[in-house]
Amino acid sequence: KVKESFKVFYKEHGLYDTVEPLSDKIRPNQIFAVSLDFPILDTEKANDVVDVIEEELLTDKGLKTLNAGDEDYRARYEGDVYNRDASYHEGTVWPWLMMGYYEACYKLKRKPKILLDVNQMLEDRCIGSICEIYDADEPRRANGAISQAWSVAMAILYL
């Protein structure tokens, strides 16, 4: 019954971000529909979701929070508090989201397109730890909290 009602999120490529109101934005949230322990998508749709993530959001530092083609996309986490907060979920790259991506690839028996250079990330801003976020566009500057537990957890889980 849950699988059937979840189909309201289906779109041609990937999943809708929200259905009330309907949002066609390409965000990383959809990767969790593939990576969670109890599959809610059939294999074809799950592969479609991972394809969208790889094409639109995957970077060498993690997943973008919004695809670059969106009108609300912000390439940099910079400026005053208001501007930084506004960019937080509008493109900024989050390393911890790779947990969902790697788990989805594993479940679908797919080779991940990118393996993060964790050794480099451990030196980006705080020696021996991984920061919270990165800029969405090159060069991907390390930003946010200089030592973020969920970013480190991602590295520990997938090393």
Language-model-derived ranges and their functions:
Residues K1-W94, L116-L159:
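Extended glycan-interaction surfaces of carbohydrate-active proteins
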